[in-house]
Amino acid sequence: MTMKLIWDKFYVSIIFVLTCIVLGIILMCTVVGGGNDYSEVNVSEGDSLWALADQYAGKSDMAKADFVSWVEKENNLADGHVEAGESVVIPVHKTKLIKSDSTIQLANQ
């Protein structure tokens, strides 16, 4: 079979498969790039992962133990110890953290 004969017979299928491949690549890039919406917080003196869990676990819809495990895993904290001045990523979407902070700020005015 020549290329012309293959194209004439299967052009709809070829276009469909190529479209699916392109859309799949776009979808994969979108999903991989969308993982950056988690908040980053600075650790203060005397803070621990459990203190961060007390403060933020309610905004993440996770149990405190799950929150601590997630933070340890995502921030590569083998012993679960954090030091003052460190930044850690927490499983709270940036929009949730900003909304709650602005509400508190408005209430204080």
Swiss-Prot record:
The keyword ATP-binding does not apply. The keyword Signal does not apply. Keywords: Cell cycle, Cell division, Cytoplasm, DNA damage, DNA repair, Septation, SOS response. InterPro entries: Cell_div_suppressor_YneA (IPR022887), LysM_dom (IPR018392), LysM_dom_sf (IPR036779). It is found in: Cytoplasm. Residues 39-90 form the LysM domain. It comes from the Bacteria. One of its GO terms (biological process) is negative regulation of cell division. GO terms for cellular component: cytoplasm. Coiled coil: none annotated. HAMAP family: YneA. Belongs to the YneA family. Inhibits cell division during the SOS response. Affects a later stage of the cell division protein assembly, after the assembly of the Z ring, by probably suppressing recruitment of FtsL and/or DivIC to the division machinery. This is Cell division suppressor protein YneA. It comes from Listeria monocytogenes serotype 4a (strain HCC23). The gene is yneA.
